[in-house]
Amino acid sequence: MARITVEDCLEKIPNRFQLVLAATYRARMLSQGHAAKIESKNKPGVTALREIAEGKIGLEMLKKVPS
């Protein structure tokens, strides 16, 4: 399986700070039981980054506040 890098994700979300926030929010959602948008057997943080790199998740994550 190919490794994910920050550079892959920065193509989708160019601001590093927004990228970290979006990935954190999404990883928290995944760890709370939300379904992943991609096939993944990785930990929630890696899955969140993979979703961002593939364009399945974007800046809309910043409009959602995880509970």
Curated annotation (Swiss-Prot):
EC assignment: 2.7.7.6
Keyword Transcription: yes
Annotated keywords: DNA-directed RNA polymerase, Nucleotidyltransferase, Transcription, Transferase
Gene3D superfamilies with a match to the protein in the record: 3.90.940.10
Transferase among keywords: yes
Catalysed conversion reaction: RNA(n) + a ribonucleoside 5'-triphosphate = RNA(n+1) + diphosphate
Domain of life of the source: Bacteria
Coiled-coil positions: none
GO biological process: DNA-templated transcription
One Gene Ontology cellular component annotation held by this UniProt entry: DNA-directed RNA polymerase complex
Assembly behavior: The RNAP catalytic core consists of 2 alpha, 1 beta, 1 beta' and 1 omega subunit. When a sigma factor is associated with the core the holoenzyme is formed, which can initiate transcription.
Protein task: Promotes RNA polymerase assembly. Latches the N- and C-terminal regions of the beta' subunit thereby facilitating its interaction with the beta and alpha subunits.
Name assigned to this protein: DNA-directed RNA polymerase subunit omega
Species per Swiss-Prot/TrEMBL record: Polaromonas sp. (strain JS666 / ATCC BAA-500)
Top-level taxonomy: Bacteria, Pseudomonadati, Pseudomonadota, Betaproteobacteria, Burkholderiales
